[in-house]
């Protein structure tokens, strides 16, 4: 009887252990099928440019006042060759990447998922959002990524980051959306998606996918005190990129509207002229409306 009880106890223990193992496995999803489907739309980008001591390129071309916020693409040699990432958005060869990846580039080479290489031409850049559009002309059948809706993502959602960290193309990492609408003081349009997916030097310009396999962000920066991933990465929302890319595709540049406004203190004369009794507030005068950048 004692031996029988002992056997039952052991079997019960094994069953409970096996059950908990199955539950643990079910709690961590496999991204293998999704990664296999998405990787062909991601490309590696290599650029060549002559060193220019007066020109700020690479990681210094678009930086935050916070020294721990890094724009992160990998440079080799004497700033002559740089590596980054990008992703195909159309069957005719348009590719989105970061402006700082191709800034000052004299040659842009794209390596596809089949390891074939193509020479790319620059279509347009928008330094204010750190976005760029390039194009390759190839007879190969390309697999474009699907652009999603970054407004629909929620903090805690799973995401995949695919890119070319340290020249290791096709690297896939997973994480969650850690926060939205982050301002890292990198530019006038800061509205970053924060993630803990591991992204490193060379990943700049690569896509961030949701679990539907749609692009919801463009990986652009990391917070790091070491130069490597510390689990705090930032991506440009794809909804912003859609508008910028459309302008770059059609015009080669982004034209923005702006308003000239003059503000002056209120006074008795001003208050009387507009029929007010109080002297509180300020007077706002609309002077100019333009549909291009102010000079």
Where do the language-model regions lie?
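Bacterial N-terminal signal peptides that target proteins for export
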Residues: 1-10
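Serine-dependent protease modules
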Residues: 24-288
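Residue-level detector of conserved catalytic or cofactor/ligand-binding positions
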Residues: 287-295
């Amino acid at each position: 009887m004692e031996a029988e009880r002992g056997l039952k106890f052991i079997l019960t223990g094994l069953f409970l252990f096996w059950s908990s193992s199955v539950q643990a496995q079910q709690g961590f999803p496999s991204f293998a099928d999704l990664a296999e489907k998405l990787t062909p739309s991601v490309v590696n980008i290599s650029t060549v440019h002559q060193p220019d001591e007066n020109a700020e390129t690479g990681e210094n071309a678009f930086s935050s006042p916070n020294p721990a916020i890094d724009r992160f693409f990998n440079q080799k040699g004497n700033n002559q060759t740089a590596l980054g990432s990008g992703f195909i958005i159309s069957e005719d060869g348009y590719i989105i990447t970061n402006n700082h990846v191709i800034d000052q580039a004299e040659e842009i080479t794209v390596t596809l998922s089949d390891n074939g290489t193509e020479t790319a031409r620059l279509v347009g850049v928008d330094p204010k959002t750190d976005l760029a559009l390039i194009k390759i002309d190839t007879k190969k059948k390309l697999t474009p990524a699907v652009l999603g809706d970054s407004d629909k993502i929620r903090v805690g959602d799973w995401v995949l980051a695919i890119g070319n960290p340290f020249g290791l193309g096709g690297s896939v990492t997973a994480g969650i959306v850690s926060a939205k609408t982050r301002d890292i003081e990198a530019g006038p349009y800061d509205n970053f998606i924060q993630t803990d997916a591991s992204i490193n030097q060379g990943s700049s310009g690569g896509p961030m996918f949701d679990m539907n396999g749609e692009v919801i962000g463009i990986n652009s920066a990391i917070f790091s005190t070491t130069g490597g991933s510390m689990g705090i990465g930032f991506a440009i929302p794809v909804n912003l990129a859609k508008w910028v890319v459309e302008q770059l595709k059609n015009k080669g540049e982004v034209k923005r509207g702006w308003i000239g406004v003059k503000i002056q203190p209120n006074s008795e004369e001003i208050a009387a002229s507009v029929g007010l009794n109080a002297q509180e507030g300020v007077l706002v005068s609309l002077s100019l409306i333009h549909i291009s950048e102010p000079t």
